[in-house]
């Protein structure tokens, strides 16, 4: 496959994170075409040259082009970056499949597992698209607003295709603001990005109940152990979970209120229902979906994940927060 770094990158998904990645790419000199599923929103973004809904007051670089038609977007590009919620991932793959040529290469920054099954997005992509296109996943500790503002950020890009990974690292990496680390462990990078959302809900619940820094740190530490156990059972490299896509993303999401998942947990810990909390946040809370999928995956793998299990019980089985805490604290004593 020949490559052409002068061809635009197509970013599919015009929410806050997709827009932020498109801004970062364009700022780095890459011609970038951003498409979203809502044509009216895309017209507004094209006219105003910013995403006033998600990232107000951050103007688009000249190299960022807004697209309304998916087919036209893909005709321009060789490299495709998918940035949609996990529950919409399969749908966007079905939409692009008939539009793909042999030249297209596919990367995603979606963090999650397949809705209602708990399957890795890589598995979903292979099933729908096939194996004729190179795949990569982009994940790590990145809040959309900080990325869009050009504040220093580091992230992990994982792929089994070394040429694709190296070329995308060159296209994304900006020495002044955006550092990209390469990895070959797609399983570990995907799991870290998905399950940290669930642990962040737990950290938010703990803080919402006023349990303090000690409890939050314990949740983060034991949460990382749960992620690592599940990852190893699926063939992930344990070292991945100590990197940007593991520990880095977990700490960021659990400790900063820019995280929707943490804010969702805070609201739950303060006695609000899941419906009330989601309505207040007003955006997709990936961890709400990820909790069920992670629980299903852990059950299939026969891996003990007590934090994930208790958050699942709270969200989907009406268990109250106090009983969740009691269940975790009263578990059988064990070695670390």
UniProtKB/Swiss-Prot annotation:
GO terms for molecular function: glycerol-3-phosphate dehydrogenase [NAD(P)+] activity; NAD binding. The active site is at residue 196. Its EC number is 1.1.1.94. It catalyses: sn-glycerol 3-phosphate + NAD(+) = dihydroxyacetone phosphate + NADH + H(+); sn-glycerol 3-phosphate + NADP(+) = dihydroxyacetone phosphate + NADPH + H(+). It is an enzyme of class 1 (oxidoreductase). The keyword Methyltransferase does not apply. It is found in: Cytoplasm. NADPH binds at residues 16-17, 37, 111, 144, 260, 284, 286. Keywords: Cytoplasm, Lipid biosynthesis, Lipid metabolism, NAD, NADP, Nucleotide-binding, Oxidoreductase, Phospholipid biosynthesis, Phospholipid metabolism. Sn-glycerol 3-phosphate binds at residues 111, 140, 142, 196, 249, 259-261. GO terms for cellular component: cytosol. It comes from the Bacteria. GO terms for biological process: carbohydrate metabolic process; glycerol-3-phosphate biosynthetic process; glycerol-3-phosphate catabolic process; glycerophospholipid biosynthetic process. The keyword Lipid biosynthesis applies. SUPFAM superfamilies: 6-phosphogluconate dehydrogenase C-terminal domain-like (SSF48179), NAD(P)-binding Rossmann-fold domains (SSF51735). Pathway: Membrane lipid metabolism; glycerophospholipid metabolism. Catalyzes the reduction of the glycolytic intermediate dihydroxyacetone phosphate (DHAP) to sn-glycerol 3-phosphate (G3P), the key precursor for phospholipid synthesis. HAMAP family: NAD_Glyc3P_dehydrog. Belongs to the NAD-dependent glycerol-3-phosphate dehydrogenase family. This is Glycerol-3-phosphate dehydrogenase [NAD(P)+]. It comes from Haemophilus ducreyi (strain 35000HP / ATCC 700724). The lineage of its organism: Bacteria, Pseudomonadati, Pseudomonadota, Gammaproteobacteria, Pasteurellales.
